[in-house]
């Protein structure tokens, strides 16, 4: 998530990316270990700090929800199409997205790391996991036995958020996922950046998360998380991911990032152009013609590289699965530990739940704006929305009108409500 605003700034200290495997290899075909069958093993029951949103448990009261939706003048929404739908918006032509009915298995992996007795100790990450697990169970029907909680206050060694345990749990989350399954990933802890080694980042840095034993085992880079949790998914599988961490804007390496207006973002060449022009003007004012030329050439190369990286990522990291990621900050921003209503919590995790409690009937872009509104009065971080495929018409639902399925309108958890 974060760092403490008062005593710990600037993000977590970066380390060179260690291209090492965990002590044990976790193949997809291996059975999941017993502790991942239930989160009760060595873990206290979650605190019920966040109650269900008004209207009760949506996964148990579908008819009641539809009645309230119809009162808004939207009519009875249709079901999503059963056939694959072409992406468009610059996505590779060979890909097609399949809508998920989300009637299958629900599984969740939630990781919260306070880094006890370490530099940069946090206070709210474990509370984030407790609050989120309760919210998922009470409002969207995620079974307790299908949740894995990794927090560093647990006695069971397999429930500690070590690098090996986190990687193993990531494999567990996506193992045997089938169309219409709903998977959920939540990380609250330190994040950072490290130099990009494979050329897939337009800013030259990979995003990383820090396990509790990162000093010994190293961090986990975004490329690896994408390979484990996104690549194996079939069309029709839903994965919702939340990263409450610093520098987390592209923590899953999803190629489609959306603005608060619902516009697909391109590489920020305008910003680069302004910086490049400023450098050229400064060099000209100094009479340094050599520097002026080198600055202009450097900008051109950087802008060209950014555009090439963006196009390459669309070709290699687009997915037919439905992967949606909400992150606590942009790649160049930090996220905050917060004290809200007497409880230490991650600002992003709190804002996410708070926004949905106030209005569970939001589109993607509405929820992104709602989360930002929750944070705007106290924090400078700007949450991001990124996807494995273009959202198209899914990004925005008008306040008035019909023809949009309620399956879409529920935004981040919409498919969990269709059980």
Swiss-Prot record:
Residues 59-71 have a biased composition (Low complexity). The active site is at 190, 246. It is an enzyme of class 3 (hydrolase). Residues 1-89 are annotated as: Disordered. SUPFAM superfamilies: Caspase-like. One of its GO terms (cellular component) is cytoplasm. It comes from Aspergillus oryzae (strain ATCC 42149 / RIB 40) (Yellow koji mold). GO terms for biological process: apoptotic process; proteolysis. Disulfide bonds: none annotated. Belongs to the peptidase C14B family. Involved in cell death (apoptosis). Residues 41-51 have a biased composition (Polar residues). It comes from the Eukaryota. It holds the Pfam family Peptidase_C14. This is Metacaspase-1A. Coiled coil: none annotated. GO terms for molecular function: cysteine-type endopeptidase activity. Keywords: Apoptosis, Hydrolase, Protease, Thiol protease, Zymogen. Its EC number is 3.4.22.-.
